[in-house]
Amino acid sequence: MVTGQSTNVDVTERGLKGMLRVCQRDDFEAPATAKFCKETLGIGTIFLVNDQQAFGAGQCEAFEAAAKELGLEVVANEGIVSNEVDFSAVVNQIAAANPDAVYYGGNYPEGSLLLKQIRDKGITSIYVGSSGVDTAELVNIAGKENAVGAYYISSSPAFDSSAVLQEWVDRYQQTSGLAADGYAIYFYEAAAVALESLSNAIDAAGGKPTRAQVVEAMAGVQVESITGTFQFDEKGDNRNA
């Protein structure tokens, strides 16, 4: 299996063979986000909201640990229920706490609605979302006026950081009719890694590789793709994430 967006550390910490991750891990993403909040945004107090799922809860747990080391005051770490649409209970808690920022760990449907509802409540705290919010749907759900000034972590480089990536983004939009985002890019990269692994296994086996041969090929695969070079450590994590 090759995953494009599974950031929970347990994905590659279980010793599974044939498991590769092209994106970053929670224990890299969340501390980097906390550092950004402290050093770039100048935040002193922050309210954490998670979706009570493996991804969101893991992000907030790692963020909280890093934030405390940096001297950020975490005023709360509250959960919301995935697939719900009314977050008034936690929004009221945020309003009462009046933090410098709100950090959301989870995916974009709930994260976008949370942003809309805290702005509708008149809360002006800076909004920072995890990589699960990295999609154009944030603007569609939260509203353009609410998305302005919001931050979220992106797994992918900036689209205009290279001509190759920008060309891919343009082709993706022309072909699919959808706006490219971090999900699209890293699922493409995951497919590229999987196909290269299969191709290498087929070549090595003379046409019909066994499962074990495919797993072996995955362990040594190296791919030059649109966002850079993909190589993996003994756990299956991307060395360049």
Where are these regions (language model features)?
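Extracytosolic ligand-binding ectodomains
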Residues: 1-241
